[in-house]
C-alpha cells in the first residue's frame, strides 16, 4: 500500500478541513492537527471551544509552552504517524501544522513528508498569535487555491490526487 504524508497549512477558514474531506472522497485519508491534543488540555483549563482571537492566542501560547516543556505536540504527531504507517485503512495522512519551525522539524525527521498551503483570498490574515502569523513564512511544496465553489474546489482536489498520489496496492 502506498502511503503519503502531507503537512497542510493555511489561515482559518481557508479550507483545510474541506480539503481533507474532499481528498477522502478520492483516496482514504486521515486528518490530524498538531493542535488537537492541545485543545483537550485547553478544555481542562476552562477553554469553551470557541475560536476567536483570544482563544486562538491561548491555544497558540499553550502549544508553545508544551513544546518548550517536553515537545508534546511533536510527540503526538509522531504517534499519529506511527499509527498511520501500521494502519492499512488509510493511504494519506494530512497533518495540520501552523508554525514554520515545526513544519521544518517534521520534514527533517520524515523525509517523504510534503507540504501544502491552502489559500483562500477571501479570508483575513490573522496576526494576533504566533502560530497564525507565521503561516506564509514557509516555502511549501504545493499551493492549493480555494477561491471558488465547493464543486470547483473538489475538482482542484481531484486533480491534485490524480497528479500526486498513486493508490495502487
Task: Enumerate the language-model features and the residues they cover.
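ATP-dependent NMP and nucleoside kinases share a basic, alpha-helical "lid"
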Residues: 26, 30, 78-135
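Walker A/P-loop
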Residues: 17
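Small-molecule kinase domains that catalyze NTP-dependent phosphoryl transfer to phosphate-bearing small molecules
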Residues: 109, 114-169
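ATP-dependent small-molecule kinase phosphotransfer cores
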Residues: 33-92, 98
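Short hydrophobic/aromatic beta-strand immediately N-terminal to the Walker A/P-loop
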Residues: 6-7
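ATP-binding Walker
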Residues: 14
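P-loop (Walker A) phosphate-binding loop of NTP-binding proteins
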Residues: 10-11
Amino acid at each position: 500500500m502506498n502511503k503519503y504524508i502531507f503537512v497542510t497549512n493555511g489561515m482559518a477558514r481557508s479550507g483545510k478541513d474541506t480539503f481533507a474531506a474532499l481528498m477522502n472522497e478520492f483516496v482514504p485519508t486521515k486528518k490530524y492537527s498538531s493542535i488537537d491534543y492541545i485543545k483537550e488540555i485547553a478544555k481542562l483549563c476552562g477553554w469553551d471551544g470557541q475560536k476567536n482571537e483570544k482563544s486562538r492566542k491561548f491555544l497558540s501560547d499553550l502549544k508553545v509552552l508544551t513544546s518548550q516543556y517536553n515537545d508534546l505536540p511533536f510527540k503526538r504527531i509522531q504517534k499519529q504517524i506511527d499509527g498511520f504507517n501500521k494502519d492499512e485503512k488509510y493511504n494519506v495522512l494530512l497533518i495540520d501544522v501552523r508554525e514554520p519551525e515545526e513544519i521544518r522539524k517534521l520534514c527533517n525527521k520524515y523525509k517523504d513528508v510534503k507540504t501544502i498551503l491552502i489559500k483562500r483570498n477571501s479570508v483575513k490574515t490573522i496576526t494576533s498569535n504566533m502560530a497564525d502569523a507565521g503561516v506564509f513564512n514557509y516555502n511549501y511544496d504545493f499551493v492549493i487555491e480555494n477561491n471558488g465553489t465547493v464543486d470547483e474546489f473538489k475538482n482542484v482536489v481531484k486533480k491534485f490526487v490524480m497528479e500526486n498520489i498513486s493508490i495502487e496496492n
